[in-house]
Structure formats: structure tokens, C-alpha cells
Amino acid sequence: EQFMGLMEKQSFDSDRKEVLDHALLTSWFTTDQCIRLMDFYRFDSEKKQLMKKIYPKIADKPNFYYAIDKLTFSSDKNEINAFIKQYHEKNN
């Protein structure tokens, strides 16, 4: 929760990106936390960037479809699903 508070304090996307990048070095995230982070972004293009960046550090990957469902367009959902498939093909 401290992390979310820190993210909320950041005025600029670039500052939020820096905080997130630092956290990704040492921390794992849940799908629920990813969904909450997605709320910081207005556009699906930004949300997709976040999802691709955070997915390797998601602790409950089987639940990630809940995050995917938050995207507006099926083409964006398909893109993230393809990314996840490719991720698992490369890392298994």
C-alpha cells in the first residue's frame, strides 16, 4: 500500500514510470495491483505498456485475465494475450 501511495503522489507519468521501474527490480506484484496501476493511465496504449512491463513480475499469472479484461478493445486484449503466449514460449 505504501507503493500505491507513492505512485499517487507522482505528478507526472515519467515520475511514475521511474518509481515502477525501481519497484520491478526487487518486488513482485499481484494482478489486483496491476489493475490498480492501470487506473493511473487514460489510454489503452499506456495500459498495454504497463501490462507488458509488469507481467514477468506478476505472482498470480493465472489471474492476469482479469487485468486483460479491463482493456477496452478486443484487438488490445488479443495483443496482450499474444504477448503472454510469446513470453511463456520463451521462458519455459
How does the language model describe each region?
Residues 1-92:
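General marker for long, soluble alpha-helical cores
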